[in-house]
């Protein structure tokens, strides 16, 4: 009986799998968010920020502008829904990969959940709450190191090696797109009326969220085998 007890203590605990359905939250969140800014970008006629009325253009202006004016309830709701669904999905995905060690699992969960937390923060604090809103966007950009670290962790698993390699490559790609966005972004009321910051930010957002969708799809496909 004592030997059996000792043997059980030596066996590492296998994390509880939350199921591929919850894992799809990592895809559902980005899809909802993308549809929101696509549709609302054509609907919005403008908003008032810091007492100044600003006509909206998806070419010139960032997605955050949709969190003000008539589109605010829908866009901010999408920001928050994206955060909640993505975090739930990420937790389910990495708890569903039993080959990962405890530290590696929670490192990946933390790294890939921070951008989702940033999305939720940006839904709670709009563009007029500049500092917390900017902090939320900064959390989104933690995907630059987060993709690389997660990729190296997944590369150690034979069945995830290819995806891990692609995720490592996503890190410098995200950095390039972030630099492109900041190079075209003018954080003034006048600056929102010209330029292509709306396009470059949307390219950055779409690229980041596409990797979350790919991660959820890859995990779900393997889980259903």
Regions found by a protein language model. Name each.
Residues 70-76, 103-108, 127-141:
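Transmembrane alpha-helix entry/boundary detector in multi-pass membrane proteins
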Residues 17-47:
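N-terminal signal-anchor transmembrane alpha helix
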Residues 40, 77-106, 148-158, 222:
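Internal transmembrane alpha-helix with an interfacial aromatic "cap," most often the third helix
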Residues 35-45, 117-129, 175-192:
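C-terminal ends of transmembrane alpha-helices
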Residues 152-225:
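Terminal transmembrane helical module of multi-pass membrane proteins
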Residues 115-156:
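Membrane-proximal helix-loop-helix units in multi-pass membrane proteins
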Residues 61-84:
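Interfacial helix-start motif at the membrane-water boundary
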């Amino acid at each position: 009986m004592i030997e059996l007890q000792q043997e059980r203590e030596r066996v590492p605990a296998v994390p509880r799998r939350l199921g591929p359905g919850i894992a799809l939250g990592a895809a559902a969140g980005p899809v909802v968010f993308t549809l929101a800014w696509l549709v609302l970008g054509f609907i919005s006629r403008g908003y008032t920020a810091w007492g100044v009325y600003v006509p909206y253009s998806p070419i010139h202006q960032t997605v955050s502008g949709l969190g003000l004016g008539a589109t605010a309830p829908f866009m901010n709701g999408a920001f928050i829904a994206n955060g909640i669904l993505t975090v739930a999905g990420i937790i389910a995905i990495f708890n569903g990969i039993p080959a990962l060690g405890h530290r590696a699992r929670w490192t990946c969960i933390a790294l890939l959940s921070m951008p989702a937390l940033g999305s939720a923060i940006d839904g709670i604090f709009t563009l007029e709450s500049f500092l917390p809103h900017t902090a939320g966007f900064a959390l989104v950009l933690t995907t630059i190191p987060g993709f690389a670290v997660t990729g190296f962790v997944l590369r150690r698993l034979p069945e995830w090696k290819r995806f891990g390699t692609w995720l490592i490559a996503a890190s410098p790609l995200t950095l390039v797109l972030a630099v492109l966005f900041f190079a075209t972004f003018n954080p003034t009321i006048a600056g929102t009326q010209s330029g292509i910051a709306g396009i470059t930010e949307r390219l950055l957002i779409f690229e980041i969220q596409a990797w979350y969708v790919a991660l959820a799809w890859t995990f779900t496909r393997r889980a259903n085998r």
